[in-house]
């Protein structure tokens, strides 16, 4: 698997020539100076970028990491990006029954352990059963991550948004 990243990058370059669209293992939005980020996959990233833009206008230093390439997991890239961030809210769209976190958050936590970064990690599961993930939901994730980044004690167990009790 160590030989696949250059192959994936070459295919992405070829795809750009044909389509005009560029893809990489991770897409970053306002991560350079962020204290807190949301890490997600898929269509949630667009909503997360919109919310991050609004929060930035309020003076909050937030960003978004969108994972494009899940396997092989971009451990080194994520570790490098998260090493500058105090707290990351990881959004999973599926429950991983019996596991301490959702699938994406488990891989982020594994990255944290393997690379010894100090970033705190929160896991939020939302969008279950095809439910919409609203900007207000993502804003809750950012706000919790910002409290965590400020050193405020927060519950770090998996939390669920938008589910019926």
Segments and roles (model prediction):
Residues 10, 18, 50-64, 113-114:
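Short helix-loop-beta junction
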């Amino acid at each position: 698997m160590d030989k696949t990243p250059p192959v994936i990058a070459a295919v992405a370059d070829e795809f750009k020539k044909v389509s005009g669209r560029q893809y990489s293992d991770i897409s970053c939005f306002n991560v350079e100076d962020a204290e807190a980020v949301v890490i997600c996959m898929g269509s949630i990233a667009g909503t997360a970028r919109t919310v991050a833009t609004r929060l930035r206008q309020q003076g909050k230093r937030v960003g978004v990491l969108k994972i494009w390439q899940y396997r092989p997991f971009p451990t080194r890239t994520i570790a490098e990006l998260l090493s500058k961030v105090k707290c990351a809210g990881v959004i999973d769209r599926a429950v991983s029954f019996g596991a301490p976190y959702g699938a994406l958050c488990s891989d982020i936590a594994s990255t944290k352990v393997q690379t010894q970064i100090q970033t705190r990690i929160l896991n939020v599961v939302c969008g279950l059963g095809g439910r919409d993930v609203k900007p207000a939901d993502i804003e809750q994730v950012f706000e919790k991550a910002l409290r965590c980044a400020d050193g405020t004690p927060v519950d770090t167990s998996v939390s669920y948004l938008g589910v019926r009790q």
